[in-house]
């Protein structure tokens, strides 16, 4: 085979970088492209219920596998995906957005085609995507098309940001040399400037030598930019107390003896707040300092000795070193750390979150008790997905087992995101290890935005746990403003009718309302095997919420009300 179609070239390249599942919807400008998926062994087309859900699914898949691909059609399809793509941009998730666009000749003639604005402007939607993409490409020349595809895939992976790739309908069947596939896409980072890297490492080593009470704080980009291994080695080598932010959940081993808890500024447990804020050196890995990730910017460090390791720069106190990538800098730092910590005497880490006290099994479920108890259900390697709202805050008090991965859209916060993300994560988990469990916690209100994607889970035989927290509406919004306002009410659904309604045959339904019912279900051996899709409706009081969310809601309401 000396030549292959451009469409097949795209999917062969994605297959080479371990993207096996493609998300999206068919439309007449991408149909010929979609044909080529079935020509590549091991590739599959998920086929989503709508483009927004497809974007969410691509995000969830990419968080587990490193990058993903969504395919939409020109105009109506691509615009429906943009909320999800914007979330991936905000949260550093590598999603390749491929858009099937009208033929080059149709564009040149400015034909009044369907899915256009009727004004002959065929670049308007491309321009809309530009501000939420790391880079964009509109392929117009078959000779350079393979190189453009390679560039887009590399950029998606390296930067962990969305990339837009427009493919005209008339080009995807044209042939390109198959030999090009023999040279793998280079997914490696370019080395740091040696002088700048050495200055960074030497400066950090001096700070470490002088520190008596240093801490390590792991955040979102420790996972997104692939430095989890380096961060673990840093903790092991230094024995410094180590903490995560809400967006950093799962980035380090929470069962490690030097793990101290989740730091969220004023919303932290008092002992965690004291441990972090009294440190004389803070090594911050992959920080993403958003409001809900910092307790509304309530970090209150006493020290000025703060080192921020980022994907493309490092900041030490007030000095910034642009272009110095944390992955290589951490690796070089690790080589010299043993000598630098010779004088360090480990300080105690905060005590673990205490277990729930025994109570009457008939006690009605409440959020504080439930989130403490969730940790007993979790297993090593689980993917834990928590929706914006009570779930995203409650999970902060749930210790993760080793190698668990947390997914929560703390920065972008688009409600309903996690249903689609659960689908994508379930595909990814199945590809990595069919025994790997995917567990979703979502509110009844959020579920109503994206519930259709459960049907896609059923269609593909995926087996996630779907915990629906039924607290009769938008509790997080009620806490911020409008406790009894009608706009925070929703229609009550029969959640246990959803799986059979969507055509499930092998499934389980459960409803739990008491502590005894929760324990009986989550401790059941068969229930703990991911052998089928499960819907678990969790009955909770309307205004019940984790303490941290109640406090965050007060902070948010105060900020929203400020006049200047």
UniProtKB/Swiss-Prot annotation:
Its cofactor is Mg(2+); thiamine diphosphate. GO terms for cellular component: cell surface; cytosol; fungal biofilm matrix; nucleus. Keywords: Decarboxylase, Lyase, Magnesium, Metal-binding, Thiamine pyrophosphate. CDD domains: TPP_PDC_IPDC, TPP_PYR_PDC_IPDC_like. It is an enzyme of class 4 (lyase). Mg(2+) binds at residues 444, 471, 473. One of its GO terms (biological process) is aromatic amino acid family catabolic process to alcohol via Ehrlich pathway. It catalyses: a 2-oxocarboxylate + H(+) = an aldehyde + CO2; pyruvate + H(+) = acetaldehyde + CO2. One of its GO terms (molecular function) is pyruvate decarboxylase activity. The keyword Ligase does not apply. Pyruvate binds at residues 28, 115, 477. Thiamine diphosphate binds at residues 390, 413-415, 445-446, 471-476. Pfam families: TPP_enzyme_C, TPP_enzyme_M, TPP_enzyme_N. Its EC number is 4.1.1.1. Binds 1 Mg(2+) per subunit. Belongs to the TPP enzyme family. Homotetramer. This is Pyruvate decarboxylase. It comes from Candida glabrata (strain ATCC 2001 / BCRC 20586 / JCM 3761 / NBRC 0622 / NRRL Y-65 / CBS 138). The gene is PDC1.
